Amino acid sequence: MRGLARVMDFMRAVSILFVGINVYWFCYSTLKEWGVTFEVIDKILWNFQRTTGLFSSVLWTKLFAVVFLALSCIGTKGVKEEKITWAKIHCSLAAGVVLFFLNWWLLELPLPHTADTVFYIATLSAGYICMLMAGTWMSRLLKNNLMDDVFNTENESFMQETRLIENEYSVNLPTRFYYKKKWNNGWINVVNPFRASLVLGTPGSGKSYAVVNSYIKQQIEKGFALYCYDYKFPDLSEIAYNHLLNHLDGYKVKPKFYIINFDDPRKSHRCNPINASFMSDIADAYEASYTIMLNLNRSWISKQGDFFVESPIILLAAIIWYLRIYQGGKYCTFPHAIELLNKKYADVFTILRSYPELENYLSPFVDAWESEANEQLQGQIASAKIPLSRMISPALYWVMTGDDFSLDINNPKEPKILVVGNNPDRQNIYSAALGLYNSRIVKLINKKGQLKSSVIIDELPTIYFRGLDNLIATARSNKVAVLLGFQDYSQLTRDYGDKESKVIQNTVGNVFSGQVVGETAKILSERFGKVLQKRQSMTINQREKSTSISTQMDSLIPASKISNLTQGMFVGAVADNFDERIEQKIFHCEIVVDNEKVKRETARYVKLPQIIDFTDKDGNDRMQEEIQANYDRIRQEVRQIVEDEITRIKNDPELCHLIREEEE
């Protein structure tokens, strides 16, 4: 190091020598007047001039001076300084070059030779000093790229799937992802949608527009039977309806499109979710009752098994099963069950106890009744009556008492596209009824030998989906694809309880997440795992700078990145198949949606059809009258059932004691 320093000092001395020679030769007359010329030097310089022409131009000696100055600066190591910047270096260097090289004309000014020489030497010296400062600063410049990537984007970018992998079930989404300082085109290939999919994201993150809509369209194109829960009806329903009209060729048997909509009976089909033909056991009645009551009382989800939770569920289940066995299930509808529940409990218990299969089922109520524990009994009954009374609505009764279609949507002989619409303003009422449709559909479609089908639930926490965890776990073998959309895991835990929420989170194979924050972002970051990342550190002391590079396992997609995703940007992971391996399952990309194409398609959309025309032959709208008449008919039928059953029991010698006990 000392030897190198001596060489650099020597080069700098040579550089200064060339500057002095330049002044000596081109300012000779003035220096002679000052008495600072030497004959020996004169001879040496004249010999150089004759042999090399070194002084034929004022620039040659300057160029040699600058070359040796540059070499001396390159080999010099200075103490690194953060405050030195390229801007300062460039300014100093530019000033030096101008003063050093562009001052020859000062020797020709119409001034005394002494003045010309002083100006020339001053500018030459100032220029040289500026260039020397620039060179010194270059050696002291702190050269590092530590702050070039302050958000660690390069370390956290990775190669993603660029192949399009299609099969008869797949959902394929085009993407753009950042890797190695450029944007690349890629694909998210959901080659096995039957392993269930989750779409997470805060409101406005693009989960419906980028993912849910694409699922609906592509699965209709590939001939799936479809069940869609449309929380903001008719957003998803119109997409499904219009896409079906344009892609009927994807089905071997032309599917029918059905709508359940409580807000507008004109645009709704009628369907009885507890149709007697699909209820083979009292357990089916219990499932229906369970779904209804937990949708009406979300706080009960975390209290399952408690006495005052199970009691109203069992009571409603007994009433549903009674309607199933009474006259072959002729009156087995949910509105009939509500009306029967609201009759005098003495009559209801008397009727239900007259059926052996219900006697043991109702024993807790009967025991309380016979022991005259009226407060307990009334509390049990009120727990069922009060929430169910919110569902007494002529429009709801109308929709739930018809039989326009059955809920086996993936029947190969009669495939269906079914959309059910909710209303955010009436969510608490409608969700209970729609939850009943959900639970029945899950039971009916999750069977072998059926058509491939899809269950799409957007805004999942707005409805309690009984049996969802079991559907996810078993649907793969029955070709049922499940897509669930919601905002984050905490929302799911709040509405489904911790245990069921954890099961749903951990059994889903395909995950899409837009912007989410908090615990959800941390859970997802852990799911995506860690990757080997480069770490660079720098140490600066008075003598030198040292840089060290190390590697460390760190989060591939940190929670902070997930919390700040732009609209349309998604992170996630997909599941693959034995014969369709996807090595890089994780993605962090923008899902590309052709906005212009979507606008053109939307502009051509037709409105959902009117299902029922309530106009009479005179052109008058009779909807309210017909719906009210249906409501009144149901109430009258239930009154008649009670009267007929009480009469039957009174006239039956084996059952009449039930009446007598009550009368006493």
Where are these regions (language model features)?
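Basic- and hydrophobic-enriched, low-structure N-terminal and domain-boundary segments
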Residues: 1-205, 209, 214, 541-542, ...
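Low-complexity, polar-biased intrinsically disordered regions enriched in Pro/Ser/Thr/Gly
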Residues: 177-183, 297-307, 535-552
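Hydrophobic alpha-helical segments involved in membrane association or supramolecular assembly
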Residues: 69-76, 435, 439, 510, ...
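Conserved ATP-driven motor cores of ASCE-family P-loop NTPases powering translocation/secretion/packaging/pilus
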Residues: 472-474, 478-575
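P-loop NTPase motor domains
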Residues: 22, 32, 36, 142-147, ...
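N-terminal charged/capping segments associated with class I S-adenosyl-L-methionine
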Residues: 586-589
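Active-site-adjacent beta-strand anchor residues
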Residues: 8, 229-230, 514
